[in-house]
């Protein structure tokens, strides 16, 4: 999604949003990530939230010139990796084995065997279409954010096919975006 993303080429407009839209976004994010309820006012302060419209119907939620969350076609909101590194417990975790790391860092989707092999881990609460944080075996910080395409039980029983669609990963265009004006 953000492999070759740059603000100059892909963001068409940035605008201040109405308070009602702002409340709606905060409510959606609070509902989606209940562990952030205590700190949501710090993450998304009133009056400083902007929406940047990008290509492919992507909305970027910008606070203090930094992208905090994004979504595509009014789908679920995903945190950026910078925010996820500040609040690592905000979303369910999945860990892939060492063999999948270089492919994930290249933007590839993650196959089920990457989670079922020796270094893999899948959280109990994983359902289909759940935003998840992807960790590498033996590493402290998340390397990607993804959307599950299989439930936990399907990952272990089928053990083939795409388990997680990678939507944002370390060193992609969104990671390298330092500010949105």
Range-by-range predicted roles:
Residues 2-58, 62-120, 125-126, 134-181:
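Beta-strand/loop-dominated core regions that host nucleotide or nucleotide-derived cofactor-binding catalytic loops
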């Amino acid at each position: 999604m953000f492999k070759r993303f740059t603000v100059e080429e892909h963001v068409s407009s940035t605008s201040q949003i109405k308070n009602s839209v702002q409340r709606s976004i905060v409510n959606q994010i609070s509902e989606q990530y209940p562990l952030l309820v205590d700190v949501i006012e710090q993450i998304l302060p009133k009056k400083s939230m902007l929406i940047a419209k990008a290509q492919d119907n992507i909305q970027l939620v910008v606070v203090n010139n930094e992208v905090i969350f994004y979504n595509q076609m009014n789908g679920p909101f995903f945190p950026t990796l910078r925010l996820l590194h500040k609040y690592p417990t905000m979303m369910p975790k999945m860990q892939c084995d060492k063999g999948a790391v270089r492919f994930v860092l290249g933007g590839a989707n993650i196959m089920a065997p990457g989670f079922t092999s020796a270094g893999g881990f899948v959280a109990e609460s994983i359902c289909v279409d759940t935003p998840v944080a992807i960790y590498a075996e033996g590493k402290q910080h998340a390397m990607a954010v993804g959307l599950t395409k299989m439930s936990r039980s399907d990952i272990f029983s089928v053990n083939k096919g795409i388990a997680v669609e990678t939507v944002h990963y370390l060193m992609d265009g969104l990671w390298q975006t330092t500010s949105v004006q």
